[in-house]
Amino acid sequence: MDRQTVNDWIVDNMLDSEAWLRAGEQKQSVAVKQAERKLALWYPEYELVVAVVTYQALWELQGVDPALKYQKHNVKTVTDNGESVSYKDGERDVVAPDVRALLGPTADELAEQEAEEALRLQYGGALI
């Protein structure tokens, strides 16, 4: 997917496009490639549509943006001089919240859940 396709989708569909507009074309292109690469790893069974790639590309750009969207990024506290940021759930999710809402858990998360469920299985038997 190219940068212009994502740009057109943002122009037509998103009000909060500040992180995209602030980034230059080179960073926008890298964000799109990075989003596609990560999404292909996390959601191998899904076709990567423009909306999903766009949400993740914006999430990537917001992550390097010094003016983070604190609430959306689940930030709990910020310290300026020590340059520390703490998150409510321990760390910033690597998957954009909008992507997670659309596609659900990643393939790795599903595999972990299945492994945990397999460990909890109890097999019945008969005493003689």
Residue ranges of each PLM-predicted region?
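Divalent metal-cofactor coordination and adjacent catalytic microenvironments
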Residues: 1-128
